[in-house]
Amino acid sequence: MTRALFIVDLQNDFTERGALGVTGGDEVAARVTAFLADHARDYALIVASRDWHDPDNDNGGHFSDAPDFIDTWPPHCVAGSYGAEYDDLFGASAVSHHLK
């Protein structure tokens, strides 16, 4: 059987230091990295996605200075920003495909 692993939005803006940070995000990044070190060879495909917003438009009204956290959010994962990059503790060397 062929296996694939999908890693979703493991980015700086979703971990402790980020615009939409959550407690434990860095720990998740470190654990995923450790898992990949031990198990990457078990997968034919390893895909990592990144939330990715264009800095030169309104992103469909997605961003707001007064977000309601339902339909609008503070600016996050803006292309080219630190927040849009993978978390500092995520070692992405085993990732075969990167999606934005």
Q: What are these model-derived regions, one by one?
A:
Residues 1-5:
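Extreme N-terminal starter segment of soluble prokaryotic enzymes
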Residues 6-10:
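N-terminal nucleotide-binding beta1-loop-alpha1 segment
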Residues 11-17:
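Short acidic, Gly/Ser-rich segments with clustered Asp/Glu that frequently serve as metal-coordination loops
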Residues 18-25, 75:
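Short glycine-enriched, charge-decorated loop/helix-capping segments at active-site entrances
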Residues 30-100:
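Active-site alpha/beta core segments
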